[in-house]
Amino acid sequence: MSNNSNKRAPTTATQRLKQDYLRIKKDPVPYICAEPLPSNILEWHYVVRGPEMTPYEGGYYHGKLIFPREFPFKPPSIYMITPNGRFKCNTRLCLSITDFHPDTWNPAWSVSTILTGLLSFMVEKGPTLGSIETSDFTKKQLAAQSLVFNLKDKVFCELFPEVVEEIKQKQKAQDELSNRPQNLPLPDVVPDGELHRGQHGIQLLNGHAPAAGPNLAGLPQANRHHGLLGGALANLFVIVGFAAFAYTVKYVLRSIAQE
């Protein structure tokens, strides 16, 4: 018997999986897309986009479903291929919707139901056979690394060209952001005629420092001299004013005495 005949699924499984495929295309599962192998409808591959507000945000997680020839009367096995920090890679996962628990399997469950259950368990932290424990930091690192990892997978690229393009666009945006020159500090600009201090305590006029030269170093000393001169003049004006007032009073008193 040839390999192709070994891979040929029974009519019941084929019909059911075709129906499930049409259902997924019409009503996609949130965050997940799935495609069967063109050569074997019993092997499906899926991609989970990491949901927002989770450690998996920004990541792309590739895995596969292996359906038995008795599907839908027996459950499939589920594998995760992309390193993710939640499940072991290329290991059968023990979930209530997999072949680890045929006693809890419901033939009415579709491929959409299976993938929804997988995503639900992925964002939880409950342990199971095939799961691992890692920190959120590690999961975020793996999410960032998943882009490059998946682009190296031939099956991934063949089955999910739209996702591949999405990843490449995201990588391009990240590269442009990282290569963008840092913004230079803006000059200190103030209204015309106003002085304020810029960096290193240098006074700026209209947002510009005075031209470099011998006078620049003497600015603080010159300002100090101007302050002393102004204070002396103010004291002199007070003394002169007081003397004038005293002379006026004396003159008035003398005039009254003569009368």
Swiss-Prot record:
It catalyses: S-ubiquitinyl-[E1 ubiquitin-activating enzyme]-L-cysteine + [E2 ubiquitin-conjugating enzyme]-L-cysteine = [E1 ubiquitin-activating enzyme]-L-cysteine + S-ubiquitinyl-[E2 ubiquitin-conjugating enzyme]-L-cysteine. One of its GO terms (molecular function) is ubiquitin protein ligase binding. Keywords: ATP-binding, Endoplasmic reticulum, Membrane, Nucleotide-binding, Transferase, Transmembrane, Transmembrane helix, Ubl conjugation pathway, Unfolded protein response. Its main location: endoplasmic reticulum. SUPFAM superfamilies: UBC-like (SSF54495). Residues 1-226 are cytoplasmic. Residues 248-259 are lumenal. GO terms for biological process: ERAD pathway; protein K6-linked ubiquitination; response to unfolded protein; ubiquitin-dependent protein catabolic process. InterPro entries: Ub_conjugating_enzyme (IPR050113), UBQ-conjugat_E2_core (IPR000608), UBQ-conjugating_enzyme/RWD (IPR016135). The keyword Iron does not apply. The active site is at 94 (glycyl thioester intermediate). Pathway: Protein modification; protein ubiquitination. It holds the Pfam family UQ_con. It is found in: Endoplasmic reticulum membrane. GO terms for cellular component: endoplasmic reticulum; endoplasmic reticulum membrane; ubiquitin ligase complex. Its EC number is 2.3.2.23. The keyword DNA-binding does not apply. The chain crosses the membrane at residues 227-247. SMART domains: UBCc. Interacts with murid herpesvirus 4 protein K3 (mK3). Belongs to the ubiquitin-conjugating enzyme family. PANTHER family: UBIQUITIN-CONJUGATING ENZYME E2. This is Ubiquitin-conjugating enzyme E2 J2. The gene is Ube2j2.
